[in-house]
Amino acid sequence: MNKWHLISGFSTVALSSVVVVQPAFAQGTAITGVQLQQTDSGIELILETPTGKQPETFRTTYGETLIIDLINTQLQLPEGEQISQQNPAPGIASVEVVQQYSNTVRVKLVGTEEVPTAKVNTTPQGIALNVSTEMKTAEEPAPTPQQPEAGQQEPIELVVTATRTEERQEDVARSVTVIDREEIEQQANFTQNLGDILGQLVPGFGPPNLQNRTSGQTLRGRQAQILVDGVPLRTNGAVDIQTRFIAPSAIERIEVVRGPTAVFGGEAKGGVINIITRQPTEQAFEATTKIGVGAALGGLQGDSFSNEQQQTIAFNQEAFDFTFTFSRNDTGSFFDAEGDRVAPTNATLDKTKTLNFLGKFGVDFTEQQRLQFTFNYTRDRREDLDFTAQASDEERGKAVAVEGDLSYEDETEPKINNTILNLNYTHEDLLGSEIKAQAYFRDTFKRTRTPNRRFVNFGPIGTVVNSETDNQTWGGRLQADTSLGNDSSVLWGIDYESQDAGNQTFNKLDVDALNEQGTVRKVGEIPILPEFDFDKLGLFAQVQWELNDRLRLSGGLRHERFTLNLEEDFNNVVGSTIEAGEENFNETLFNLGLVYNFSEQINGFAKFSQGFSAPPFGDVISIAPNFAIGNNFDEIQPEKVDEYEIGLRGNWDNINASLSAFYNFSALGANLIVPSEPGEISRLARAPQRVYGVEATLDWQIEDNWQIGGIVSWNEGDSDNDDDGDFQPLSTGQIQPLKVTAYLENQTAPDWRNRLQLLVVGSRDRAFEEDVDVSPINSYAVLDYLSRIKLGQGTLQIGVENLLDNQYLPAVSQSSLAGNLPQNAFAASGRRLTINYSLSW
């Protein structure tokens, strides 16, 4: 969730298609000197910079105080990182310039009787603040300062490519959450797992699940598409591991579009999570080094120690720029609040070593033309796995870790690999239109951990296995943003994507070697899902029209055609032969929205949008009896979701708030019914589904050094699995309980900041009472603490996760307490300490 001092319009907004782009700097613009001189109307404050470029600013006032935050700036002064002067001019009591945050310089101006006014301009020396006051002196009356014209001194305008074009956040007719670099770094002190960071900060998204996948983390009760710089990460039927495809250190900002959208294509029934990688620097050279350690505080067990290293290097040589980030993270083992080792499952993050490389190369051919190539590689390895999970008795209420050392042979160790290649070209004015073209390729490989048990859901297999999935995706986008005159524009274009999906096998393992020696040895393969091609072609157009100062309309459509092709017959695990074939589908989807400004501080929006996704073909092909591509058309039809949403946004001097309500419905939902008893087979139910909910956000700067805020997120949902008009609750895997977060921050000293943050997850037993869930979900609360202090030339950060050492099971883990997978009911970590130090040079 965004902080008030970093946002302009409001912290949550959007439209029915979205990616977010905003000019941002990997490090700050350096302020190397400060000059202050008295003028006829007050003072002129010169902040000397090497670039002379005016940064984005945010203003607020209280009492007789004016605060101006300069975003993406850093003080680099020989006299230290604070400048202050008392009574510099009549009517001005004090002036103070401080490094408020790692990327924010704050100018604080205090008047004697009135709030000073200030205009920010650029000069050859740097940034000039012309400060004046309405106070009059006896010798010479000061001229009355002119108030800024409407729009002249607006706060920062975060832009959202809601229609794949840049827009002011307050102009978007839907809910969007923007997570900036500072917030990402803040949460990364507690976890390097992106899914848990999103769970802490995004309304409508499931709470942190402490796993390497987003199971139990839907967005408004449905699956979200995840993009990296516009490259889609989710292929048809893929395991939800996409948040492991990039490290937080490689991210500049994240835009989350809440609710179905189709402008970026399919797989976005719940919305879009667009991850924007680190942006080029404006300095000739910048670098940041970070190291950190962590451990469980219960007993500082040796196995619990974690470590991380990060390095960022950026160059900018006129028309050429280069950005490189490297990060390494070793999680160690986890221990719960009772001092027990957390039971390791296939999805837990213990003993995980992660590497991430991001390289970005850009060339500006002219002021209007730019070519950029991005390479991102991520690798997860789980090593030294000397414990396995085992179901415990009901009294303990959790799975337990059982010692059992495993050694892997011949490429059988669990891992996740992902590679992204992305080429972008931009022409800002080609025949009157802004043109953007993109080509991308992605390769993903995943091998699961070997469980010390037999798979019970697939009786025909009858042996111990682990699974492998390997798929590739390539595609491209071409779009043009054309002005229509009269404050209106149209974005139009074409997308194409080809997925080499499926290709999943179970590795048959040597049972005797596993049981007697703990050796994981592959002795054969069992095909689970055949390789199939899934191609998509989309045409779209989106119109924006500002009717007047109060009313703005938007609307558009997308026509999508896709083809499923299974080239060879396939024998699935239940003994059925799936006949080869090809099937073509098409969908046309619409969106319509309006924004109305009730006043300068308050606006409202309403929208209708549609999203769609093909069902996970693997869930159909791998377990369905007597299935044929051409004959079972209804089972593989795309799921189309309609959503209606209304909302209010408010932006005052020191408060940002939002409130939205939504209802979405799909006539042909795709709900995987998981068996509750061993030996049963999962099935995919294609039936009507509905989801509804309310979301609220608040950020309040109480006074100069204190800030509070939080989010409230509640949703519910039902499915008519038998299509008889009798709806039953959706499972907790799809509908997460009430989520409430809150934070309190204090700037204790100019170089010292402290934060407490609370996560409360409510109970949910509605699905359990109607025999949908195998366990009720009990509520829990987690309190975290973070302290950041300037130390030497760098910054020291100390974080304590689960400060009160609360013993609990995450919601997704509680849902496994009963049923056929009780060994997956792992507890959360107890109190855990992290310490890291970063240095920019």
Residues covered by each model-derived region:
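Surface-exposed extracellular loop regions of Gram-negative outer-membrane beta-barrel proteins
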Residues: 379-383, 387-392, 445, 500-502, ...
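Signal-peptide-cleaved, periplasmic/extracellular N-terminal interaction regions immediately downstream
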Residues: 22-151
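A beta-strand signature from Gram-negative outer-membrane beta-barrel systems
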Residues: 246-290
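Membrane-embedded beta-barrel scaffold of Gram-negative outer-membrane proteins
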Residues: 424-426, 433-452, 597, 603-609, ...
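Gram-negative outer-membrane beta-barrel transporters
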Residues: 290, 548-549, 562, 661-666, ...
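Short acidic/polar hinge/loop motifs at secondary-structure boundaries
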Residues: 207, 215-216, 231-258, 309-311
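C-terminal beta-signal and adjacent terminal beta-strands/loops
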Residues: 612, 760-767, 788-841
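Transmembrane beta-barrel wall of Gram-negative outer-membrane proteins
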Residues: 300-331, 336-385, 417-429, 484-485, ...
